[in-house]
Curated annotation (Swiss-Prot):
Belongs to the glycosyl hydrolase 27 family. This is Probable alpha-galactosidase B. Its main location: secreted. Keywords: Disulfide bond, Glycoprotein, Glycosidase, Hydrolase, Secreted, Signal. The keyword Secreted applies. Hydrolyzes a variety of simple alpha-D-galactoside as well as more complex molecules such as oligosaccharides and polysaccharides. The active site is at D155, D247. Disulfide bonds join C45-C77, C127-C157. It catalyses: Hydrolysis of terminal, non-reducing alpha-D-galactose residues in alpha-D-galactosides, including galactose oligosaccharides, galactomannans and galactolipids. GO terms for molecular function: alpha-galactosidase activity. It comes from Aspergillus fumigatus (strain ATCC MYA-4609 / CBS 101355 / FGSC A1100 / Af293) (Neosartorya fumigata).
Length: 447
């Protein structure tokens, strides 16, 4: 069902949450992290209505819709590249790619019980050089609403010089000469105490937020500003999710580096606001099955948006099984607990080490729906290694252990990947993990 709201609710859209303003939308849109599919990682600019409807139908036929995946998102390259309509100033859908327009595709997607997303950028052009929305926020938001759009991914390309920030924020991606989470090559840092909410980047994204909340349709707002301008200070009051890094690629070094960066941002995760480590690469490139598992498990545990980016009509059963893991999806979509899993021990490194090659290896998170605590153990090394979860080290288990005093107890443990009951496990659980694999457990009631 499509959710609408009147202009009178726009003034009330910012609501106090977690001690800061969060973008709260009608119908609980954006309260939980988004689940869906996007064209970019699979097809880049090679898109059309047929490919998008194929994906939408596969989301239904493969059972992904029943698991909560609902957004079918069109990324860059959907419009006429030469410019806007001269009389209306509206962006024009490419008639060769979309003969029935975007609204025609939206109608078909809605008929499947799914939602549709679109893409633009907070600049003059998109990353692929198509018309973007800076200076046209109101007309574009109105156009998207009229087409039946439910989700906007808003990129950070095509920014003119008069909208460039005064200072440069440190995003410690590999390749930026980052050192332990710092950027020593940054020659234009902001002074101490600088409020990044006053930056031009923040203003560009606020303008589209304000345009979206002024239309009579609820559109989820996904910021894609690549972690710039200290977005963690203002992202939650501006959008429903915000990118924390540069783009992902289907390679383990990049996935590990993003997981490492995002692991330090878990205090920003709760209902209505989600740091976004970028779309999923499950099923793409030359990732091993273990790496696909680790990628998905970490993204789900961090309660990141889970946006599939592979061709669903040719997906393997192994990759589909990863994307369909009911236990991880239940944790991700918990209606009572908004907080994510968090690292409780780094494992390979001393705790709180910033290491793009070796992110935190031990994670845990409370759940209201799993009957226990989610525990992950990652092998970030390049060879098979043994990993051990010690119950007394897991924060969510300490209260139970403390109440038992010196009595030696165990916990009922379930393997998340197989669903197998591993029995009553006392003190600790050990497992041999191949390179870049992850063990995922639900540690349940005491026994």
């Amino acid at each position: 069902m499509t959710t609408f709201f009147s202009l009178t609710t726009a003034a009330a859209v910012l609501t106090l949450a977690r001690g800061s303003n969060a973008l709260v939308r009608p119908g609980n849109v954006g309260k939980l992290p988004a689940l869906g599919w996007n064209t970019w990682n699979a097809f880049g600019c090679d898109i059309d209505a047929t490919k998008i409807m194929t994906a939408a139908n596969e989301v239904v036929n493969l059972g992904l819709k029943d698991l909560g995946y609902e957004y079918i998102n069109i990324d860059d390259c959907w419009s006429v590249k030469s410019g806007r309509d001269a009389s209306t100033q509206r962006i024009i859908p490419d008639p060769d790619k979309f003969p029935d327009g975007i609204s025609g595709v939206a109608d078909q997607i809605h008929d499947l019980g799914l939602k549709i997303g679109i893409y633009s950028s907070a600049g003059l052009t998109t990353c692929a050089g198509y018309p973007a929305s800076l200076g046209y926020e109101d007309i574009d938001a109105q156009t998207f609403a009229e087409w039946g759009i439910d989700y906007l991914k808003y990129d950070n390309c095509g920014v003119p010089s008069n909208w460039t920030d005064t200072y440069t924020y440190c995003v410690p991606d590999p390749g930026s000469k980052a050192t332990n989470g710092t950027c020593p090559d940054n020659k234009n840092p902001a002074p101490a105490g600088y409020d990044w909410r006053t930056s031009l980047t923040a203003e560009r994204y606020r303008r589209m937020r304000d345009a979206l909340v002024s239309v009579d349709r609820t559109i989820l707002y996904s910021l894609c500003e690549w972690g710039q301008a200290n977005v963690n200070d203002w992202g939650n009051e501006t959008g429903n999710s915000w990118r924390t890094t540069g783009d992902i690629t289907p390679s383990w070094p990049r996935i590990a580096a993003i997981a490492n960066e995002n692991s330090f941002l878990m205090n920003h995760v709760d209902f209505w606001g989600y740091p976004d480590p970028d779309m999923l690469e499950v099923g793409n490139g030359n990732l091993t099955l273990a790496e696909n598992r680790a990628h998905f498990a970490l993204w789900a545990a961090m309660k990141s948006p889970l946006i599939i980016g592979t061709a669903l009509d040719s997906i393997s059963q192994d990759h589909l099984a990863i994307l369909s893991n009911k236990i991880l999806l239940k944790f991700h979509q918990d209606p009572v607990i908004g907080r994510p899993a968090q690292p409780y021990k780094w494992g390979y490194n001393p705790d709180w080490t910033f290491d793009p090659a070796h992110p935190a290896e031990y994670w845990s998170g409370a759940s209201s729906v799993l009957g226990g605590t989610l525990v992950l153990m990652l092998n970030s090394e390049d060879t098979t290694q043994r990993r051990t979860a010690v119950w007394k080290e897991v924060p969510e288990l300490k209260d139970v252990l403390g109440r038992q005093g010196k009595r030696r107890i165990g916990f009922r443990v379930t393997d998340v990947w197989t669903g197998k009951d591993l029995g009553c496990v006392r003190d600790h659980y050990s497992v041999e993990l191949e390179s870049h694999d992850v063990a995922a457990l639900v540690v349940g009631r005491a026994c």
